[in-house]
């Protein structure tokens, strides 16, 4: 990775792109330090820390801690991610959107992007309103009234919209995927906090603390190696193209492959599963923890669905597997792939074009997705199990964060390598 960046730095055009990307990240970090007025950040930080296993805790991790500090960029890229997922699902459910995405070409892509932007602003407005209501209900506001409410909500909506714009600028003038890189920077900003927590844990546990932290570091390194290998792993189905004559020229006849990535859906199944699985705990957090003596039944239910319970881990793991299959079928439709192969004169050796081909692709997809889903589940719940073993010690960076950081790093390096390769070909042709 460092070697690739050094080589890219030697190319003037790529150096400008890298500098531009770093400037955008600097602006993002400055925005993360600007507080929104009328909110007591100390009380808010204590409240968010108590909600570490809920949806609010997930938002805090994804924003790099800005959510708990009530900064202008507190909502971060979450509204954009949510709107992208919703539009993606609506594209499948609504035929008009499906046709626009499939047959609209460049104009269709721009229209979908425009719809996603409007949806981002709408979701940011709802989340900003929810943020304000939490602060109001838990007496976190320093001043209440219509004007403070407007200032807080507008600040969050404007901040989220500006973050979306920053990501789009990186897409156009920088390197890699802008939203992913901003998410990457936000998560990495939590590393000093994690180091501080590790130091506190060692101080409280003594020599045994050193042993646990050493094992934790080894586990994180092993997880990174696993993520790198699985992210790059793919199943390649051989494809043969029939020869065809157009005029006096003969086309086709070459062999190719149909790549099928093991982790096709990325980190989305984990985000969706965590949001849904932690909803009961989030509701209990708002209602209040039931008393064990006065409400034993309610307390038993609360203990069963708590984010540190065994039942939660099982439900969370199964949800990740379910969402992995759901997203895999969305992104890799066997029937559509089979039809495209048939139209272009391609076929899989040993299988007739049409239904037999689609059935074979679906069978392979199910096997590959199962492995990828189990991998995602293990990576997601491993930090929770480790935290439970360490006396409910809460990790500042979990499995979801590690997958995002490693995935974005690999994606950015690949983008740099492809741009360097493109410029080598350009120089040769010139």
Residue ranges and their predicted role:
Residues 1-430:
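N-terminal cationic and glycine-rich segments that engage phosphates or anionic surfaces
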């Amino acid at each position: 990775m460092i070697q690739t960046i050094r080589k890219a730095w030697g190319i003037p055009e790529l150096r400008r792109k890298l500098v531009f990307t770093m400037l955008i990240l600097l602006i993002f970090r400055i925005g993360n330090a600007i507080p929104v007025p009328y909110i007591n950040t100390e009380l808010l930080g204590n409240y968010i820390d108590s909600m570490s296993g809920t949806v609010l805790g997930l938002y805090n991790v994804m924003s790099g801690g800005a959510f708990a500090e009530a900064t202008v960029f507190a909502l971060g890229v979450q509204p954009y991610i949510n709107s992208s997922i919703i539009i993606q699902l609506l594209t499948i459910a609504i035929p008009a959107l499906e046709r626009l995405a499939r047959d609209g070409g460049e104009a269709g892509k721009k229209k979908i992007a425009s719809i996603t932007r409007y949806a981002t602003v709408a979701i940011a407005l709802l989340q900003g309103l929810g943020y304000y209501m939490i602060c109001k209900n838990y007496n976190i506001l320093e001043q209440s009234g219509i004007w403070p409410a407007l200032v807080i909500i507008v600040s969050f909506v404007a901040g989220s919209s500006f973050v979306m714009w920053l990501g789009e600028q990186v897409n156009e003038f920088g390197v890699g995927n802008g939203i992913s890189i901003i998410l990457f920077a936000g998560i990495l900003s939590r590393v000093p906090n994690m180091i501080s927590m590790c130091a506190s844990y060692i101080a409280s546990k003594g020599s045994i603390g050193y042993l646990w932290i050493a094992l934790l570091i080894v586990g994180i390194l092993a997880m990174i190696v696993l993520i790198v290998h699985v992210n790059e792993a793919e199943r390649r189905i051989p494809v043969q193209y029939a020869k065809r004559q157009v005029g006096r020229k003969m086309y086709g006849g070459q062999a190719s492959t149909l790549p099928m990535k093991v982790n096709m859906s990325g980190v989305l199944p984990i985000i969706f599963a965590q949001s849904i699985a932690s909803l009961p705990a989030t509701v209990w957090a708002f209602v209040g923890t039931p008393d064990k003596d006065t409400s034993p039944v309610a307390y038993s239910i609360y203990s069963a669905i708590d984010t540190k319970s065994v039942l939660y881990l099982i439900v969370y793991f199964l949800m990740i597997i379910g969402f992995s299959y759901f997203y895999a079928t969305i992104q890799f439709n066997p029937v559509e792939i089979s039809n495209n192969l048939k139209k272009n004169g391609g076929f899989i050796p040993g299988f007739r074009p049409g239904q037999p081909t689609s059935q074979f692709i679906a069978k392979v997809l199910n096997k590959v997705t199962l492995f990828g889903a189990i991998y995602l589940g293990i990576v997601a719940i491993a930090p929770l199990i480790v935290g439970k073993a360490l006396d409910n010690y809460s990790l500042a960076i979990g499995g979801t964060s590690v997958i995002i950081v490693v995935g974005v790093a690999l994606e950015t390096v690949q983008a740099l390598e492809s741009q360097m390769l493109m410029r080598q070909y350009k120089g040769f042709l010139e």
